[in-house]
């Protein structure tokens, strides 16, 4: 892709946007940057981009007339149904995201693409660790926080790019083709962005739309939505399941993880897996399938599964104070993720939940919570919505708080020896925090300040 002298409109000045601008500049593109935030809110970012000469900014509003551009690159947080984006699309402008741009500019590394409503980051990190320990030139990139485009100068055909992909990123691909794709699960999420469940599923399925019979697609057999996508996939499908025996896949049999892709192999007892919970067992089986089809040594895979400590903000142990365990699951940004979190523990749970409203339904979460959760501590935009739903389910011990400091303090005061205080909000963080990472850090800081 030759971008020298081309006019490129970049929409969205987040982390991927900054990296994209720097690479577009190196390639000689003429850059127009648009962000809905104004100059004052973007001051630090603008300072970082001072060295770039051929750049124009349209800030605080979306552009009205940019007909003379050659290409549009959208950051993941930018909806593709914005009026000016639709106008550009209808006029025939080429619109892609950072992942697609990086794919086109790359030196043909091996892409592994991993998506799903939940478990993406853990599985991506797990696969990255497996390939790293196998001495492969490995990059862990994508939605996990490392822009894919930052690898284009250092990666080669021998490199492996383990890429976490959100539905937002998958909306804006065109020719992106991973050697191995994986869809871990699909449950209701981001309907404020995609509007319908069908559109959300369609975005997730984009991960395999360019794959051929020479590629592999790893799918969760236990997830009916995911399983139904197999008929649309041209790649060789490898299933994983913890409830059924699957031919040509990875499954659980008498507490043993079985690999049955070429020959049947009794691989590892599930109790030897270091990560807790049934959902993490599924993540591990997906990682096994990915690594196996890439011909990683089985002993390396086994060693990683037995020692991997997990990822920050994903059911992360914070502290044991007076025999009360504090757990940070700030990445639990939808009800299904929080259901999986509370089902991982056999102690009474004080659940801290609430955040930005994404249009989620909390009925199933609170129905499940009746068997696990003794108290609810609620904050953020959705606090009253969750409270009303909880009362309808018979919850009585509900506490509405104004911020994380009060949430932790209240949880501490009502806790008893043997309890778990679990931050798993079931909501996005953006009503109160810049990111789920900042929210998780605030929780940990407040927990560690308890005397």
From Swiss-Prot:
Q: Does the keyword Chloroplast apply?
A: no
Provide the E.C. number(s) assigned to this enzyme.
6.3.2.9
The main enzyme category here is ligase
Binding of ATP, residues: 116-122
Catalysed reaction(s) here are: UDP-N-acetyl-alpha-D-muramoyl-L-alanine + D-glutamate + ATP = UDP-N-acetyl-alpha-D-muramoyl-L-alanyl-D-glutamate + ADP + phosphate + H(+)
Tell me the compartments it is located in: Cytoplasm
Q: Name one GO biological process term.
A: regulation of cell shape
Keywords (alphabetical) are: ATP-binding, Cell cycle, Cell division, Cell shape, Cell wall biogenesis/degradation, Cytoplasm, Ligase, Nucleotide-binding, Peptidoglycan synthesis
The organism sits in which domain of life? Answer: Bacteria
The record's GO molecular-function terms, alphabetically, read: ATP binding; UDP-N-acetylmuramoylalanine-D-glutamate ligase activity
For this UniProt entry, what's an example GO CC term? cytoplasm
Which Pfam families does this entry report, sorted A to Z?
Mur_ligase_C (PF02875), Mur_ligase_M (PF08245), MurD-like_N (PF21799)
Chief location category: cytoplasm
UniProt keyword annotation of Cytoplasm present: yes
Q: Which SUPFAM superfamilies match?
A: MurCD N-terminal domain (SSF51984), MurD-like peptide ligases, catalytic domain (SSF53623), MurD-like peptide ligases, peptide-binding domain (SSF53244)
Q: In which pathway does it act?
A: Cell wall biogenesis; peptidoglycan biosynthesis
Function, in words: Cell wall formation. Catalyzes the addition of glutamate to the nucleotide precursor UDP-N-acetylmuramoyl-L-alanine (UMA).
Q: What protein is this chain from? A: UDP-N-acetylmuramoylalanine--D-glutamate ligase
